[in-house]
Amino acid sequence: MECSTYTSSQPNLVWGENIDVEISGVGRNITEELRDVSGGKKERRMQRLVRKREVNEAGRLMSTARNESFKRAVSLYRAGAHLSSAMTTVSPTSIIHLFKLSPPNGRPRAQTRVRCSIAEGPTISPSSVDGRGTVDCVVVGGGISGLCIAQALATKHRDTVPNVIVTEARDQVGGNITTVERDGYLWEEGPNSFQPSDSILTMAVDSGLKDELVLGDPDAPRFVLWKGKLRPVPAKPTDLPFFDLMSFGGKLRAGFGALGIRPPPPGHEESVEEFVRRNLGDEVFERLIEPFCSGVYAGDPSKLSMKAAFGRVWKLEQIGGSIIGGTVKTIQERNNAPKPPRDPRLPKPKGQTVGSFRKGLSMLPDAISKRLGSNVKLSWKLTSISKLDNQEYKLTYETPEGLASVQTKSVVMTIPSYTASNLFRPLSDVAAGALSQFFYPPVAAVTVSYPTEAFRAECLIDGELKGFGQLHPRSQGLETLGTIYSSSLFPNRAPPGRVLLLNYIGGATNPGIKFKTHSELVEAVDRDLRKVLIDPRAKEPLALGVRIWPQAIPQFLVGHLDILDTAKSALRDIGFRGMFLGGNYVSGVALGRCVEGAYEVAAEVSDFLSQQAYK
């Protein structure tokens, strides 16, 4: 029996790791003890108990009490429930009830002492989730992946996974999603936007954010810096002939290569650079794909895996013999397959656009967390994982109230791979070693503002800066990876007459940025912008925010998928079925892929628990 099998009717009564059950020789009955607690010694006794409070393993504690005795103790406690209002007036408090128990088998009566703690805020007990002390799933990590997995389980798989909790080591949810609002500005210091796929739109609608969605102008141009000039990027392949970013010869090479007139695939896993140069030519790589890799992954395309980082494009060649052949085959298969009806609740974005929310991306994790309510546990740091004899898991946490343990049928680890590696080390060196191999380079998000008149005239359209933003190939000599025109992309991001720019700097090819000061990073960004976008004579920018992420974006390097499979196989080999890996190093780094991956993991958890139910 677990201590957490009893759930108090009082919502802030803590059971589980904060219950001590001991056999005691104290010869007083319940009425005497209650009289003592409520008398003049009340204050001193409460303070002494708080100071001496110990946290013990629930299983060890329960082994000291007979099951029948504990049941009788619980019954007596319920009979004294009228004390709950008095108990909640002191927080935190420990009150001891000494229950005089009748022997169930004629043996000398034992004395059971039950200590309860009154906690501030929501209960920390897992038993509060389902009343039994064992939950169906614990999602470790309250970033966007973890929250979306929990939301997907709650909305799509409630019948098979009714009881889910999310634990987050920090005091807030959202992971790298960080929205700041100040002095009329609203900016992001992590991800900036998302592709409005049906998955992320469903998540937004289910979270009550349909009316908060904002979508960018689908016609807003994207620019790449090439030879000192910002050049628009073709929005689709058919636009390629009409843009000056590439030469006529480069366009021909790309077209013939896409049709399959190019060298055959090699016998090894290709990097992004190898794949693109072979299929589409040098110009496409150098002027489009290389800056795109820098903008999305902050990565080095000579090391990124095409199969892992851009698997959908890689697969086209596999299924169709060429990029065009695979595209045609994919369209045919899609047209021939029965198409499920689209959720009528979802908005219909127009064209190639991006999305956010009226008050920034943080609205999504905040809304999901609010819907999950007390099932989201903040400031819960996972310290150990163990497998129980009944094939369930025991997770032990450091919490603001002390140690707490949760017993669960399944676990989804959405924390960064390097953190998961440390937790798995005592269980599997192979799994821990595999997860430790993933590389996260540093990236800094630098947000600045200029007045509209500070921009070069040739960069304005009808007197305004319009567009999504600009990317900078490494060969062009700028340190910043790219710049997003935040106030042009979404409304109400800056005061009238001001332009808000979000700049990313660092990445796999420039890891030294983590040693720079904030002022040095602002100077680097301003220096680069004056070479391209800002009038060199303009005044210094208003520096709003600098956020350095020391380990920002997992790199999907060559061998990434094999390493991930090694970690998963190692967990299966030690009997850790029901232990799932999630997060951006599994699903992909784009916000939309994190949400799509969340639905996929939720389905896997549901399938696992459904199978377990029939065993």
Cite the ranges covered by each PLM segment.
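Dinucleotide-binding Rossmann-like beta1-alpha1 core, especially the glycine-rich loop
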Residues: 183-265
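Peripheral membrane lipid-binding modules
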Residues: 2-29, 33-35
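Mid-domain catalytic core of redox enzymes
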Residues: 113-115, 119-121, 130-133, 374, ...
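Beta1/beta-strand and adjacent pyrophosphate-binding region of the FAD-binding site
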Residues: 127-145
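Active-site/ligand-binding neighborhood in enzyme catalytic cores
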Residues: 252-399, 407-410
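A short alpha-helix-loop-beta-strand transition element characteristic
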Residues: 201-223, 283-287, 437-440, 461-462, ...
